[in-house]
Amino acid sequence: MTIRPLHDRVVVKRLEAEEKTASGIVLPGAAAEKPDMGEVIAVGAGKIGKDGARRPLDVKAGDKIIFGKYSGQTVKADGEELLVMREEDIFGIVEK
């Protein structure tokens, strides 16, 4: 199943969370925090402004992003947990 987001929404796959603390303590699955970084899988065509023009999104598929811990709606596709969120919920793009 493929999810094609509409308007200014993006589909994001969370990056794997660290399962060890900085001091080396291994965290059980429930204790590990959900990561607030992910990879953009798909983007919508953009939001339509008041003038009727479509504004393209600043993010694109493949971008690594930072978002709020409680951003987006969780969905399952092909056994994989993904997030669907608005572009405004994204704090920034991680550049190397």
Curated annotation (Swiss-Prot):
<dbReference type="InterPro" id="IPR020818">
    <property type="entry name" value="Chaperonin_GroES"/>
</dbReference>
<dbReference type="GO" id="GO:0044183">
    <property type="term" value="F:protein folding chaperone"/>
</dbReference>
<dbReference type="GO" id="GO:0051085">
    <property type="term" value="P:chaperone cofactor-dependent protein refolding"/>
</dbReference>
<dbReference type="GO" id="GO:0005737">
    <property type="term" value="C:cytoplasm"/>
</dbReference>
<dbReference type="Pfam" id="PF00166">
    <property type="entry name" value="Cpn10"/>
</dbReference>
<dbReference type="GO" id="GO:0005524">
    <property type="term" value="F:ATP binding"/>
</dbReference>
<dbReference type="GO" id="GO:0051087">
    <property type="term" value="F:protein-folding chaperone binding"/>
</dbReference>
<comment type="subunit">
    <text>Heptamer of 7 subunits arranged in a ring. Interacts with the chaperonin GroEL.</text>
</comment>
<keyword id="KW-0143">Chaperone</keyword>
<comment type="function">
    <text>Together with the chaperonin GroEL, plays an essential role in assisting protein folding. The GroEL-GroES system forms a nano-cage that allows encapsulation of the non-native substrate proteins and provides a physical environment optimized to promote and accelerate protein folding. GroES binds to the apical surface of the GroEL ring, thereby capping the opening of the GroEL channel.</text>
</comment>
<dbReference type="InterPro" id="IPR011032">
    <property type="entry name" value="GroES-like_sf"/>
</dbReference>
<comment type="similarity">
    <text>Belongs to the GroES chaperonin family.</text>
</comment>
<protein>
    <recommendedName>
        <fullName>Co-chaperonin GroES</fullName>
    </recommendedName>
</protein>
<keyword id="KW-0963">Cytoplasm</keyword>
<dbReference type="GO" id="GO:0046872">
    <property type="term" value="F:metal ion binding"/>
</dbReference>
<dbReference type="InterPro" id="IPR018369">
    <property type="entry name" value="Chaprnonin_Cpn10_CS"/>
</dbReference>
<dbReference type="InterPro" id="IPR037124">
    <property type="entry name" value="Chaperonin_GroES_sf"/>
</dbReference>
<dbReference type="GO" id="GO:0051082">
    <property type="term" value="F:unfolded protein binding"/>
</dbReference>
